[in-house]
Amino acid sequence: MVNDKDLLSFDYKKDFPLLAANDVAYLDNSATTQKPACVIEAERDFYLKHNANPLRGLYDLAMQATDIYEDARVAVQKFINAKSEQEIIFTRNTTESLNLVAYSYGLANLKPGDEIVTTIMEHHSNMLPWRMVAQQTGAVVKYIECAVDGSISDEAIDAAVTEKTKIVAMAEVSNVLGRLNPIAKAISAAHKVGAVAVIDAAQSAPHMAIDVQKMDADFLAFSGHKMLGPMGIGVLYGKKELLEAMPPFLSGGEMISFVSRDGQDSNIMRMHSFYRKGKNTLVLLCSFTADNMHTGNILHSIKR
């Protein structure tokens, strides 16, 4: 374990060009973080040395770009201890990740009378998509009651989750209160009634080790920009068997093996439809990987 004295004495500002060059005390990290030099340099390095379209071409630069793309997924897989890199979906942010689950999984699996359980402290990105999906499917949104201090008890979770519950959606850490919520209990309660658990880790991933296998979350979402990475990159983790069964959220290139004029003979590859439609800004993936390693090293040092 790294002691508090060592953590406090380290000059963290030198890693961040904006902070090192200015007399600034930046305290808005829950909204977005400043970027360390390694992230900025990785972005610049990509444009200088590797810029090409991944997953398509067979020439050297395209192959390098593809390697960078796939290496980024492996890096995130290791960061959250997913079973496979195929369980890592790159999105634009946590909001898009949660909407992907709500609209792809939710619309396909909810029916009238089903219940979606969440909390009143959720970020709107983990509340409004469920309300909108409930309106379209006839499902009902229920809220786990919070105590006056903002805490959530095991009893409150048990009272909210019933045999009608199909989805339990909860933030691991509240973006308003900063509270660490009992997601282990929420996930366990969901699985006891056959529901899936959706975890918003936007505020927890930057500050604590995430182990999706240990927590047994079905889906988990977070953003790069809240954990020293670039804006425009988010992550959705989903258990492979759930992703394989979900209909496409968006459609486009690299998600289909062939297509006919009338569409009747088209062959959609479901897993590919999530992580290969269109192109994420590859340079952001490159810098996000650098950030991922930077953040991972810090968390590992603190844990050790």
What does each model-found stretch correspond to?
Residues 1-304:
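Pyridoxal 5′-phosphate
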